[in-house]
């Protein structure tokens, strides 16, 4: 995990976690090629990572993912996916599973 997930050249970008490592040739978080799973950050993926990291004793990393996810949605609104470099929202507006951020907020409040 430390070698890849926390690597700023792969997954640990300003608004983690991209669906493809930033070091991959096909990384396209700006959605230029209209390939949605080639780099954007998705809240449903962050939600799964958050709970998995907490379950395995990495609450510190989970909290960072939650904090950056909350900031990203606060900045760009409820969108389908986000650019992991800028936090800009892309795709559909008011996308349902992005409301999983509410679960992250509640979980973070319960651990504070």
PLM ranges: what are they?
Residues 40, 50-52, 62, 66, ...:
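Small-side-chain structural scaffolding
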């Amino acid at each position: 995990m430390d070698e890849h997930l926390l690597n700023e050249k792969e997954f640990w970008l300003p608004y983690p976690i991209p669906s493809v490592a930033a070091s991959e040739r096909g990384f396209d978080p700006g959605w230029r090629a209209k390939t949605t799973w080639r780099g954007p950050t998705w809240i449903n993926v962050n939600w799964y990572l958050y709970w998995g990291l907490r379950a395995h004793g990495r609450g510190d990393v989970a909290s960072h993912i939650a904090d950056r996810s909350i900031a990203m949605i606060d900045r760009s609104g409820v969108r389908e996916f986000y650019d992991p470099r800028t936090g800009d929202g892309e795709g559909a507006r008011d996308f349902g599973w992005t409301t999983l951020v509410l679960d992250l907020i509640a979980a973070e409040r319960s651990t504070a």
